[in-house]
């Protein structure tokens, strides 16, 4: 199968530049605002969109993304509404890849077969489910592949040579390298070590490698971009949105403008980095 993710990374490889992968939480601070953010991301320079699925017990998320998920849930966001966001986005944009990211529990409750059918119909291209290890591929990974949806795995600095083949088995779309141990948004990555890790993973796969966790500024994104096929930014975007909200999580400023300003700056830095490296 060839998905929008495969097509996008092939295009970017031909252009000689890495991808900017942008994460935000579906339904934060509300469905309408969140959908506006989603629609604005490609115009601001996002190459791939990670659409967060809010969950009440997000063990791998830092405080910012946990708070975003809570705001979304309090505003009435559901998995069905998050899928609806993808479908609405697809009415205007049929090329930007959408990756839904979150935890298995909401998908399990929704029903795996129903979820995959609805995700495919809504124009979703990939899934990142952080709490489903490769030993549980039969639960969702293999059914997703059969449905034509990429299943994207996380690798970390502690993924050793014995574990790596298991992580990569049945992976598709791209590999998400978590540049440090811990929760999202927790620290700053060591770019030299990131480069070494990416080169090591590439010995075992032809999939693009995207690096995330700890990328907050355009400068950090540019530094990571010299080593990877893509840079993932999430917490910084979530924080940009949160900065425009009042103490009750309601918009007091312009969350859409704040998010797009940041993404535009990130995109400019990421794109310039590879161009400079190619000269």
From Swiss-Prot:
Cellular component, GO annotation: cytosol
Q: Please verify whether the record's keywords include NAD.
A: no
Q: What are the positions of the active site?
A: 50, 61
Q: What are the protein's UniProt keywords?
A: Amino-acid biosynthesis, Aromatic amino acid biosynthesis, Lyase, Tryptophan biosynthesis
The GO molecular function terms of this record are: tryptophan synthase activity
**Pfam families annotated for this entry?**
Trp_syntA (PF00290)
Q: In which pathway does it act?
A: Amino-acid biosynthesis; L-tryptophan biosynthesis; L-tryptophan from chorismate: step 5/5
Q: What does it catalyze?
A: (1S,2R)-1-C-(indol-3-yl)glycerol 3-phosphate + L-serine = D-glyceraldehyde 3-phosphate + L-tryptophan + H2O
* PROSITE patterns named among the record's database cross-references: TRP_SYNTHASE_ALPHA
Might you give the EC number(s) for this enzyme?
Answer: 4.2.1.20
**Keyword Lyase in record:** yes
Family to which this protein belongs: Belongs to the TrpA family.
Q: How does it assemble?
A: Tetramer of two alpha and two beta chains.
UniProt-listed NCBIfam families: trpA
Q: What does this protein do?
A: The alpha subunit is responsible for the aldol cleavage of indoleglycerol phosphate to indole and glyceraldehyde 3-phosphate.
Protein name as it appears in the record: Tryptophan synthase alpha chain
Q: Which organism is it from?
A: Brucella anthropi (strain ATCC 49188 / DSM 6882 / CCUG 24695 / JCM 21032 / LMG 3331 / NBRC 15819 / NCTC 12168 / Alc 37)
Taxonomic lineage is: Bacteria, Pseudomonadati, Pseudomonadota, Alphaproteobacteria, Hyphomicrobiales
